[in-house]
């Protein structure tokens, strides 16, 4: 409330007090205002209301942190990543330790918030979620257009860590190709007794594939017809690969596509932060470093909060 409005009300209350002898606080209560309001107004008589929203708080992001955030996000090229991804990426790289909600407000305030990735549709989760690496392996083929010719990308994806264990780019969708991938994955992880989750393609229902799975001491499960969510982890990885790599590059044949896709797979496993696993990399989760990395981030955030408190305390003194 402005000073003129408050002065007009208090003047009227005082006039009524002189006429009736009723205490001003009681008259305030007749107006539906707490008695404490009169004491507050009387204590700062003839003084404009001063809101404290402009007073720096100890948890405010410092100007230097804001500058670094604006510079980093302004120069970040991949606008398909959301603000949560950028928040934890900056924590890991030591740019600034701010929570996603804080980064959201800074981006909004500085006009650095373009159209990010669309929110995922709420879907069924399919099979029970794995609790450790090499418990569930997902596999499938995906079309990749290379110089006007269709190739077929296939991989084995760990369901717990989202790590791409093995992959290749084939010219056909023969069952032998997927059998080679499963064999390679078993050679890399001989102690694994994973459940291979796949669709109902003929490559996965053939006698040769089923015999190979039994011989390698693995298990297999087919997804329900017309229910791609059951194999959604590998389907989502295929979509990410096409969005971030395939549609951005121009391949001159399969020999040119393989090394470029290989570099992206290495980036996906070792550098790209994955939203489904706490914005960590698949390699970190697969190696059992999830709790260690989350604890490291919590420590960084704690020290950043303490540094901000010290900064604003020194500014006030």
What are these language model-derived features?
Residues 1-33, 42-52, 68:
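Residue-centric detector for conserved, function-critical "anchor" positions
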Residues 71, 75, 92-97, 101-157, ...:
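Mobile-element integrase/transposase regions
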Residues 26-48, 103, 260-279:
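K/E-rich alpha-helical interaction surfaces of small helical-bundle regulatory domains
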Residues 188-206, 226, 231, 280-283:
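Acidic/histidine-rich, metal-coordinating catalytic segments
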Residues 195-200, 214-233, 249-254:
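RNase H-like polynucleotidyl transferase catalytic core
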Residues 4, 37-136, 286-290:
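Basic, flexible linker segments flanking DNA-binding modules
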Residues 158, 169-174:
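A short acidic/small-residue loop/turn micro-motif
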């Amino acid at each position: 409330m402005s000073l003129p409005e408050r002065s007009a009300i208090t003047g009227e209350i005082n006039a009524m007090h002189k006429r009736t002898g009723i205490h001003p606080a009681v008259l305030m209560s007749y107006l539906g205002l707490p008695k404490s309001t009169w004491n507050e107004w009387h204590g700062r008589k003839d003084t404009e209301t001063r809101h404290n929203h402009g007073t720096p708080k100890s948890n405010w992001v410092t100007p230097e942190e804001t500058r670094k955030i604006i510079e980093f996000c302004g120069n970040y090229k991949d606008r398909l990543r959301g603000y949560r991804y950028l928040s934890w990426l900056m924590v890991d790289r030591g740019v600034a330790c701010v929570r996603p909600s804080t980064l959201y407000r800074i981006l909004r305030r500085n006009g650095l918030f373009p159209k990010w990735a669309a929110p995922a549709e709420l879907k069924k989760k399919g099979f029970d979620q794995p609790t450790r690496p090499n418990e569930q392996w997902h596999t499938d083929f995906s079309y990749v257009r290379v110089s006007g010719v269709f190739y077929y990308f296939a991989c084995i994806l760990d369901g717990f860590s989202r790590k791409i264990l093995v992959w290749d780019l084939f010219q056909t969708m023969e069952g032998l190709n997927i059998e080679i991938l499963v064999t390679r994955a078993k050679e890399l992880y001989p102690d694994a007794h994973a459940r291979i989750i796949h669709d109902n393609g003929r490559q996965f229902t053939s006698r040769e594939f089923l015999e190979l799975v039994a011989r390698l001491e693995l298990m297999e499960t087919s997804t329900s017809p017309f229910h791609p969510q059951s194999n959604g982890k590998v389907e989502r990885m295929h979509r990410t690969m096409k969005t971030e790599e395939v549609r951005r590059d121009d391949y001159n044949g399969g020999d040119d596509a393989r090394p470029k896709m290989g570099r992206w797979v290495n980036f996906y496993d070792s550098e790209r932060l994955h939203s489904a696993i706490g914005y960590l990399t698949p390699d970190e989760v697969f190696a059992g470093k999830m709790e260690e990395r989350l604890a490291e981030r919590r420590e960084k955030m704690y020290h950043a909060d303490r540094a901000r408190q010290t900064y604003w305390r020194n500014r006030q003194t």
